[in-house]
Amino acid sequence: SVTIGGTVSPAGGNFEEPVTQATLKVVGAFHGLSRERSDARKYPSIHPIDSWSKYQGVVDMARVEEARGILRRSSEINQMMKVIGEEGTSAEDYILYQKGELLDAVYLQQNSFDPIDAACEPERQAHEFNVLYDVLTRDYALSDKKEIRAFFNQVRQEFLDWHGTVYGTPEFAAQETKLTDLYRSKVTG
């Protein structure tokens, strides 16, 4: 198997120029680096909305597309909140924004200083995504923004603690139970 990597750094970040467009037509994946994500210390600083791959992953593509849709909508809500503020955002939109932030923090970022979180085997990646997908697709009995923020921060921390456990161990299972009990306690219906 041969893997070839190439880089293109268009002047001013203009991806419409001919060399960049020609390169994008022949590659199987694109990792768009983001100054904004790097400045926010979100590593790896690969922009999750601009980046793409033609290769089959370990996670069901329909679920990936649904998660990507949540991420896009969360980004739109974030841009809207920069203009009108958090106060002008409905609780429903704020929950969707928090879901996107959760997806970004617990699945798209990693802690390279943690020997367990630095690399993830495909089975664990698929398993964790399925749990995260369940979190993302549920409706929650939350209405106050302070409560929404606190809830998603707590869920985020439980995910990050889960990332520090070895896959398949009793500690891994115990942390997963703690996480699922937490988010299911606020599920409606």
Where would I find each of the regions flagged by the language model?
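C-terminal non-catalytic accessory extensions
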Residues: Y167-G189
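P-loop NTPase catalytic core
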Residues: S1-L160, G168-E176
